[in-house]
């Protein structure tokens, strides 16, 4: 089972690919998709879509796991995040991948044992749980790894 974990965002989206082979979890790859806030939103969404599509084609995931988002007090920010999630979900649907959504507190509790863990705690635990993640320093990327990890350990694959 290969999971594509996604920490959705319009400006700095984290993605990660984690596999489960013979009851062993294996980190395959991860990265950040950054868009320029000065670009038109449709160009930013197209860039996210085309970059994630390359990841899907390279790693052939069976499923995508995406973090649920909360409504921000800033309605414009929430709307833009909704656009990014829509573009991501459309791509997931186009490749006929199963998809699971996880609340941030669920991901934190699964990875650290504490549902309100800080970003540095998440990063530390990801590095302990999955070999190959030692060079990850970006919290968006670490969150994507954590989302994929959560999907694999909570869904009994």
Swiss-Prot record:
It comes from the Bacteria. One of its GO terms (biological process) is DNA repair. PROSITE patterns: RUVC. It catalyses: Endonucleolytic cleavage at a junction such as a reciprocal single-stranded crossover between two homologous DNA duplexes (Holliday junction). Its EC number is 3.1.21.10. It holds the Pfam family RuvC. Belongs to the RuvC family. This is Crossover junction endodeoxyribonuclease RuvC. The RuvA-RuvB-RuvC complex processes Holliday junction (HJ) DNA during genetic recombination and DNA repair. Endonuclease that resolves HJ intermediates. Cleaves cruciform DNA by making single-stranded nicks across the HJ at symmetrical positions within the homologous arms, yielding a 5'-phosphate and a 3'-hydroxyl group; requires a central core of homology in the junction. The consensus cleavage sequence is 5'-(A/T)TT(C/G)-3'. Cleavage occurs on the 3'-side of the TT dinucleotide at the point of strand exchange. Signal peptide: none annotated. GO terms for cellular component: cytoplasm; Holliday junction resolvase complex. Mg(2+) 2 binds at residue 67. It is an enzyme of class 3 (hydrolase). It comes from Rickettsia africae (strain ESF-5). The gene is ruvC. Keywords: Cytoplasm, DNA damage, DNA recombination, DNA repair, DNA-binding, Endonuclease, Hydrolase, Magnesium, Metal-binding, Nuclease. Mg(2+) 1 binds at residues 7, 140. SUPFAM superfamilies: Ribonuclease H-like (SSF53098). Binds 2 Mg(2+) ion per subunit. Homodimer which binds Holliday junction (HJ) DNA. The HJ becomes 2-fold symmetrical on binding to RuvC with unstacked arms; it has a different conformation from HJ DNA in complex with RuvA. In the full resolvosome a probable DNA-RuvA(4)-RuvB(12)-RuvC(2) complex forms which resolves the HJ. The active site is at 7, 67, 140. It is found in: Cytoplasm. Its cofactor is Mg(2+).
């Amino acid at each position: 089972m290969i999971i594509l974990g996604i920490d959705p965002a319009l400006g700095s989206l984290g993605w990660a690919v984690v596999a489960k082979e013979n009851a062993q979890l294996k980190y395959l790859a991860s990265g950040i998709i950054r868009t320029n806030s000065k670009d038109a939103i449709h160009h930013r969404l197209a860039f996210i879509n085309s970059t994630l599509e390359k990841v899907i084609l390279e790693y052939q995931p069976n499923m995508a796991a995406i973090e649920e988002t909360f409504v921000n007090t800033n309605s414009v920010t929430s709307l833009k995040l909704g656009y990014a999630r829509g573009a991501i979900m459309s791509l997931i649907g186009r490749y006929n991948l199963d998809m699971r959504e996880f609340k941030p507190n669920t991901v934190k509790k699964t990875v650290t044992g504490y549902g309100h863990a800080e970003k540095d705690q998440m990063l530390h635990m990801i590095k302990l749980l999955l070999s190959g993640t030692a060079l990850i320093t970006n919290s968006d990327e670490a969150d994507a790894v954590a989302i994929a990890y959560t999907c694999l350990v909570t869904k009994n694959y």
